[in-house]
């Protein structure tokens, strides 16, 4: 589940391309010498009493986001509005609640301010009906990639419950801006969107994207949808060493399908077999298998693991032991891949198997032997705790 928690917070994660809107004031706010001000100046300019901040005062303060610059990652560059709001929070100032500020800020002429409004829509319990209605009205005509990214992030868990928002998320997956498409890949992969018709197909299409960051997100988050249709395209990518930088994301996508930490609910044998097949890649290299893939299923929930293991009849610790042993013996592989092969054995295999694994590790003499042996000792120490 992908959640955005909180009521009043900054826009660090919701920033387009450099925009000419930086410097334009919003909502009728007075002109200020923003570039030469500090956060203290900003608070003094707009707030009379920190313990009794009015809605109008706070909206005027937030409207100064319009002076902030949006960078190519669709994030706001460092700005004093962020700092001023943080300082007010640190000072225990009484700030208006999101339910009061969202709708008026969504109507701002400033895209930075509209982005802030979207960032305040989502809570742990999801967006309210009134906020969703206001958001949908704005999004009918919204074209700016910065605002769309913020909206996708805020509404990412709503696609399976609201057809109109679902349609918006699917359209964002086709946006011309790669940053928006990446955010759509993350959002569509929310477990809340399992019932969104078209989500799986959109993720599979994003796996073919021209931008590797988009592909990486699609490979990783698609598995959260619990649909075996994503196994084949992930498996094909894992066979291509040219995509080695994407391999750990692909394996994480598979792991969601068969291991699903911490809930341990999913039991896809096809995804498990694809994972094991990847670890059997020969002859291997310093990049393949990816070291982060080896550690992608080493955490486990003491509450749910045993029940999962009973259902996951495909999960064979003897097989896992042999596969990890193959990694640690293969001198073609990177030292981290070999060293971290100790971790799945420690997490899932028997004490006897772990000890036998140590015998092999301690007999290594190649240039990476000490690193691997040190990693084994770290796992041994944890098991003895």
Which sequence ranges carry the predicted segments?
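Sec-dependent signal peptide recognition
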Residues: 1-4
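C-terminal motif of bacterial Sec signal peptides marking the signal peptidase cleavage site
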Residues: 10-13
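Bacterial signal peptide processing site
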Residues: 15-17
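N-terminal, intrinsically disordered, polar/charged segments of Gram-positive cell-envelope systems
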Residues: 21-30
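Structural detector for internal amphipathic alpha-helices that build alpha-solenoid repeat scaffolds
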Residues: 33, 40-49, 60, 71-94, ...
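Amphipathic alpha-helical scaffolding segments comprising HEAT/armadillo-like alpha-solenoid repeats
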Residues: 39-40, 52-72, 93-107, 126-140, ...
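Terminal, low-structured helical/coil segments at or just beyond the last alpha-helical repeat
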Residues: 355-385
């Amino acid at each position: 589940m992908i959640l955005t928690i909180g009521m009043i917070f900054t826009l660090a994660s919701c920033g387009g391309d450099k925009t000419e809107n930086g410097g334009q004031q919003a909502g009728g706010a007075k002109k200020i010498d923003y570039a030469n001000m500090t956060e203290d100046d900003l608070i003094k300019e707009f707030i009379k009493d920190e313990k009794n901040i009015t809605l109008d005062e706070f909206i005027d303060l937030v409207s100064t986001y319009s002076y902030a610059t949006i960078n190519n990652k669709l994030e706001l560059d460092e700005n004093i509005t962020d700092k001023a709001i943080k300082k007010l929070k640190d000072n225990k100032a009484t700030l208006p609640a999101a339910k009061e500020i969202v709708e008026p800020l969504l109507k701002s002429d400033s895209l930075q301010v509209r982005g802030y409004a979207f960032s305040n829509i989502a809570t742990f319990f999801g967006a309210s009906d009134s906020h969703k209605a206001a958001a949908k009205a704005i999004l009918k005509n919204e074209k700016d990639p910065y605002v769309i990214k913020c909206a996708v992030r805020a509404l990412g868990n709503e696609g399976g419950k609201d057809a109109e928002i679902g349609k918006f998320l699917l359209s964002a997956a086709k946006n011309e801006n790669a940053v928006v498409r990446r955010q759509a890949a993350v959002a569509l992969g929310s477990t809340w969107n399992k019932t969104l018709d078209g989500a799986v197909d959109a993720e599979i299409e994003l796996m073919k994207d021209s931008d590797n960051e988009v592909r990486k997100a699609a490979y990783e988050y698609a598995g959260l949808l619990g649909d075996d249709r994503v196994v084949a395209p992930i498996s094909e990518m894992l066979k291509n060493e040219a995509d080695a930088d994407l391999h750990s994301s692909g394996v994480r996508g598979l792991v969601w399908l068969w291991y699903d930490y911490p809930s341990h609910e999913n039991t896809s044998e096809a995804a498990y077999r694809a994972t094991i097949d990847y670890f059997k890649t020969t002859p291997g290299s310093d990049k393949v298998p990816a070291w982060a893939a080896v550690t992608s299923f080493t955490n486990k929930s003491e509450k749910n693991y045993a029940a999962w293991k009973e259902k996951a009849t495909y999960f064979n610790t003897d097989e896992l032991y042999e596969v990890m042993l193959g990694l640690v013996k293969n001198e073609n592989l990177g030292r981290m891949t070999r060293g971290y092969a100790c971790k799945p054995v420690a997490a899932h295999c028997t004490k006897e198997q772990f000890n036998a694994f140590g015998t092999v590790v301690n007999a290594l003499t190649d240039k990476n032997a000490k690193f691997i042996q040190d990693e084994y000792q770290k796992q041994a120490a944890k098991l003895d705790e």
